[in-house]
Amino acid sequence: MERKRYIFGNWKMHKTAKEAKDYLSVFCPLLEEVAPVSCVGITPAFTALHACCESIKFFHSPLWLGAQNVHQDTSGAFTGEISLPMLKEFDVNFVLLGHSECRHIFHEEDTTIALKVGAAAREGIIPVLCIGETLEVREKGATEAMLSNQLMLGLAQLPETASVIIAYEPVWAIGTGKVASAVDVQEAHAFCREVLANIFSKEKAEEISILYGGSVKADNAEGFARCPDVDGLLVGGASLDPKVFADVVANFHR
């Protein structure tokens, strides 16, 4: 069974609603030209979700819409938070959870991330569980222990039959310009699949798509595509320019 491929652009705290609309007026036609086999998506800021939703409908685009985070409860006294029902109003398909910036800047813990993963899956929004080791952990030779721990804890609340996507992003390669080699990435992804087989089953593990993120650019996307356990990309800075992001998508399918 061939795994589904995904390429997601994470805009982080960039682009107003107007800027997002201008972006999609360029990107949606480019995506149609590229006609990728992969499912392509973007995660704008919460304030731009409505504008993106409307633009995607206007262009009749297959582009997926994602969110950068979400609260695990459907409502409540949680100032500044966004709920899953709110995301569903904008036809959100997927949500990033456990991104390294949320873990390290906002101190999100694995137990909280697990609750979010389970809640998203139950609401019909695909959780994208982000994992990855820090430079300190890597230098200590403890990468596998950290990845295994993040997977086991982060997936603890996932319903048995629910879909999930894993995104491996070595923290030391995010926004630093440092890029993990294709060999290193393949080894990490293969290890993650072994862990998934232990958590679920070998059959389930073979169905789960694992994406790579970490200074992904148009000129290295093709190399990652050749790795047998890399099923797509989570793109940061290179997704902020519509033409560059379209090149990333095109090169991944060469």
From Swiss-Prot:
It is found in: Cytoplasm. Pathway: Carbohydrate biosynthesis; gluconeogenesis; Carbohydrate degradation; glycolysis; D-glyceraldehyde 3-phosphate from glycerone phosphate: step 1/1. PROSITE patterns: TIM_1, TIM_2. GO terms for biological process: gluconeogenesis; glyceraldehyde-3-phosphate biosynthetic process; glycerol catabolic process; glycolytic process. Its main location: cytoplasm. It catalyses: D-glyceraldehyde 3-phosphate = dihydroxyacetone phosphate. Substrate binds at residues 10-12, 175, 215, 236-237. Keywords: Cytoplasm, Gluconeogenesis, Glycolysis, Isomerase. One of its GO terms (molecular function) is triose-phosphate isomerase activity. Its EC number is 5.3.1.1. InterPro entries: Aldolase_TIM (IPR013785), TIM_sf (IPR035990), TrioseP_Isoase_bac/euk (IPR022896), Triosephosphate_isomerase (IPR000652), Triosephosphate_isomerase_AS (IPR020861). Pfam families: TIM. The active site is at residues 99, 169. GO terms for cellular component: cytosol. Involved in the gluconeogenesis. Catalyzes stereospecifically the conversion of dihydroxyacetone phosphate (DHAP) to D-glyceraldehyde-3-phosphate (G3P). Homodimer. Belongs to the triosephosphate isomerase family. PANTHER family: TRIOSEPHOSPHATE ISOMERASE. This is Triosephosphate isomerase. It comes from Chlamydia abortus (strain DSM 27085 / S26/3) (Chlamydophila abortus). The gene is tpiA.
